[in-house]
């Protein structure tokens, strides 16, 4: 399990899919590629030059830690080159079909999982509830749609079948609606999707009798499901909002035709109001309320607040530092571009009266605790959620770029007893689960699709997912930090014992995200090398930790983990990076479009994965948390960890504790 220590080395490069221009070599677990900032995959300080960020080129290579990836290709074999439109080349074809399977979805004859002798299984029917990258795509349970269709015609075909009742039962209709709504953005942009829906309803208005009525009812059903799924995500899409409003007015004109659908039209009215943001004037719109990003400010009242979902138009406070470590505090939209941020900094620095070109003389740089620097391009946006755990934004001139150094308090941590020595494992585990449930609930299910499939375009829609991934990395570094700051060998062994207890309790709470993060923190190379400390651990806890390592073992596509989570009932907090890995294999393992034709089986498999996430959150979390005298203090501690994310510094601390350990 040694590769576990490589988990989410650096959010700036791993989560955002960026190429980092680094300072000093990062070593294991630092920014850059597998070798860190100064190793293979990282920029090498001044020699690396000022390199811009390349975001999310491939989630399987950039987001996922090494232990989650598939084995490398054989020497001499070139990886598939993505074709125009972002689709990977070299997709396997269906035997005997002459090409990939598109819209004709029929059961393949013959024995085995691909053949007859039983119904085709959906991904959720596997023992793991997680789609294995090695499994074939699965056909949807609804009837075949017939001949291949282009994206602009597929929606019409689906609406025709809904209007004609060809799906035979309501369950198949619901799955059909859900598949198209969840995955339409893979082949049809949202605004285009709504335009097609609007045009279909207008054409149905010229038809007489049951046929026209059936088409309008199908259009109403599709719009309702679309709005019910997207809701808040559409609040920032002005073009989509106008189309929805026009379609809503058309439907309400024919309200008398929907006597049997009175509840649906009422629901439509409520949903459209949500999209249009009809908020009383005396209340400040949510998009204008300043929301705290954890780690930006350490005020107790902020970190104790229940987490709410972020949107691109939300405003936050953020510090932007100067080369001398002075700073200005700016108020900015979460989706603000680098150019907008520099404009706010320029105004704060009272440069506004200078010549117009003065703003362009400043650049924005993300500097990590290890000294690695990333030059941000003026057109980049949503940079706040892509920052690493201890990374900060610096505004400087190009001449002072090389002189930038990290803030001193981030690389000088005084050892000694911390809060972890005073709290009970049960309290820590429960607060971890409660906080991570809040963060997990904030992630819209479509953020997973946008993150994997849309890259740059989905940046502002994936802020909550990126914050959850950043938190997972933070917990991992917190475990390593606390162990390595404990100088007394006896206390250090007790701390290992406490963290193993916390991992066990998180697993009991069905919080597998925290469980994974704690185990990987203990498996950090700087911690696992402390042989003398581990020898002091009782045999019972050594055996328990071995079981945890086996559970997090990536062998056979994480078989142990998948078997455990398949037996859990909601609510469950899954190990989110593994969901992204599965979606990435779906994306890169088969094409969405070939010659303009839509691969329906891929859409259905992606939708099944999203429904798995929905299932995990289908019930509320209920923890038996007794209010202790230090309840708020423990809650604040768990939500605002102070960590060292510089792996070189962690190794230095480790060698000071046990210089000769192997």
UniProtKB/Swiss-Prot annotation:
Compositional bias ranges of the Gly residues kind: 20-48
Xref: Gene3D superfamilies: Phosphatidylinositol 3-kinase Catalytic Subunit, Chain A, domain 1, Ras guanine-nucleotide exchange factors catalytic domain, Son of sevenless (SoS) protein Chain: S domain 1
GO BP annotations, alphabetical order: G protein-coupled receptor signaling pathway; nervous system development; Ras protein signal transduction
PANTHER family: GUANINE NUCLEOTIDE EXCHANGE FACTOR, RAP GUANINE NUCLEOTIDE EXCHANGE FACTOR-LIKE 1
Reported function: Probable guanine nucleotide exchange factor (GEF).
InterPro entries named in the record: Ras-like_GEF (IPR008937), Ras_GEF_dom_sf (IPR023578), RASGEF_cat_dom (IPR001895), RASGEF_cat_dom_sf (IPR036964), Ubiquitin-like_domsf (IPR029071)
Highest taxon, organism lineage: Eukaryota
Biased composition (Low complexity): 49-64, 120-135
Organism encoding this protein: Homo sapiens
A single GO cellular-component term on record: plasma membrane
Domain called Ras-GEF: residue spans: 424-660
GO molecular function: guanyl-nucleotide exchange factor activity
Annotated gene: RAPGEFL1
Start-end of Pro residues biased regions: 73-82
Keywords, comma-separated and alphabetical: Guanine-nucleotide releasing factor
Protein name in the entry: Rap guanine nucleotide exchange factor-like 1
Keyword Transmembrane among record annotations: no
């Amino acid at each position: 399990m040694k590769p576990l220590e490589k988990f989410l080395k650096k959010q700036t490069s791993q989560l955002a899919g960026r190429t980092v221009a680094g300072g000093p070599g990062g070593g294991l677990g630092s920014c850059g590629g597998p070798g860190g900032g100064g190793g293979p995959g990282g920029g090498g300080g001044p020699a690396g030059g000022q390199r811009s960020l390349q975001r999310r080129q491939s989630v399987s290579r950039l987001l996922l830690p090494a232990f989650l990836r598939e084995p490398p290709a054989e020497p001499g074999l070139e990886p598939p080159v993505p074709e125009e439109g972002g689709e990977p080349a070299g997709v396997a074809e269906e035997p005997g079909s002459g090409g990939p399977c598109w819209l004709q979805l029929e059961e393949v004859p013959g024995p085995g999982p691909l053949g007859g002798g039983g119904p085709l299984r959906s991904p959720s029917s596997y023992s793991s509830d997680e789609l294995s990258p090695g499994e074939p795509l699965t056909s949807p349970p609804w009837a075949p749609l017939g001949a291949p269709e282009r994206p602009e015609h597929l929606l019409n075909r689906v609406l025709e079948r809904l209007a004609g009742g060809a799906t035979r039962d309501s369950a198949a209709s619901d799955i059909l609606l859900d598949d198209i709504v969840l995955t339409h953005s893979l082949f049809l942009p949202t605004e285009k999707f709504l335009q097609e829906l609007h045009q279909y309803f207008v054409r149905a208005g010229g038809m007489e009798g049951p046929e026209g009525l059936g088409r309008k009812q199908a259009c109403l059903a599709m719009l309702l499901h679309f709005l019910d799924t997207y809701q808040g995500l559409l609040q920032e899409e002005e073009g989509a909002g106008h189309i929805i409003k026009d379609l809503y007015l058309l439907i309400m004109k024919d309200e008398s035709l929907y006597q049997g659908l009175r509840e649906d039209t009422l629901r439509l009215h409520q949903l459209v109001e949500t999209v249009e943001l009809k908020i009383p004037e005396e209340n400040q719109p949510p998009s204008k309320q300043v929301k705290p990003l954890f780690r930006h400010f350490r005020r107790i009242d902020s970190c104790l607040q229940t987490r709410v979902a972020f949107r691109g138009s939300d405003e936050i406070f953020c510090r932007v530092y100067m080369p001398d470590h002075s700073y200005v505090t700016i108020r900015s939209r979460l989706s603000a571009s680098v150019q907008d941020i520099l404009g706010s900094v320029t105004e704060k620095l009272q440069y506004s009266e200078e010549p117009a070109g003065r703003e362009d003389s400043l650049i924005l740089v993300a500097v990590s605790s290890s000294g690695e620097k990333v030059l941000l391009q003026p057109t980049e946006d949503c940079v706040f959620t892509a920052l690493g755990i201890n990374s900060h934004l610096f505004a400087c001139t190009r001449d002072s770029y090389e002189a930038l150094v990290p803030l001193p308090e981030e690389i000088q941590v005084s050892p000694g007893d911390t809060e972890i020595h005073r709290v009970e494992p049960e309290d820590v585990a429960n607060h971890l689960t409660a906080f991570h449930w809040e963060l997990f609930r904030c992630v819209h299910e479509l953020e997973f699709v946008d993150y994997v499939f849309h890259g740059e375009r989905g940046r502002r829609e994936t802020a909550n997912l990126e914050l959850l991934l950043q938190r997972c990395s933070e917990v991992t570094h917190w475990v390593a930090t606390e162990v390595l700051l404990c100088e007394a060998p006896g206390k250090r062994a007790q701390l290992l014992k406490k963290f193993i207890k916390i991992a066990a309790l998180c697993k009991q709470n069905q919080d597998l995200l925290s469980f994974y993060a704690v185990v990987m923190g203990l498996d950090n190379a700087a911690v696992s090398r402390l042989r003398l400390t581990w020898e002091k651990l009782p045999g019972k806890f050594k055996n328990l930790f071995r079981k945890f390592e086996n559970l997090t073992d990536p062998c056979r596509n994480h078989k142990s983990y998948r078997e455990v989570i398949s037996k859990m009932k909601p609510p469950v907090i899954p190990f989110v990076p593994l969901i992204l890995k599965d979606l990435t294999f779906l994306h890169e393992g088969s094409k969405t479009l070939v010659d303009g034709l839509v691969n329906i089986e891929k859409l259905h498999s992606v939708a099944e994965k999203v429904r798995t996430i929905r299932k995990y959150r289908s019930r509320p979390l209920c923890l038996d948390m007794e209010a202790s005298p230090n309840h708020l203090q423990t809650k604040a501690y768990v939500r605002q960890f102070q960590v060292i994310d510089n792996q070189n510094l962690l190794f230095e601390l480790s060698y000071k504790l046990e210089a000769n350990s192997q």
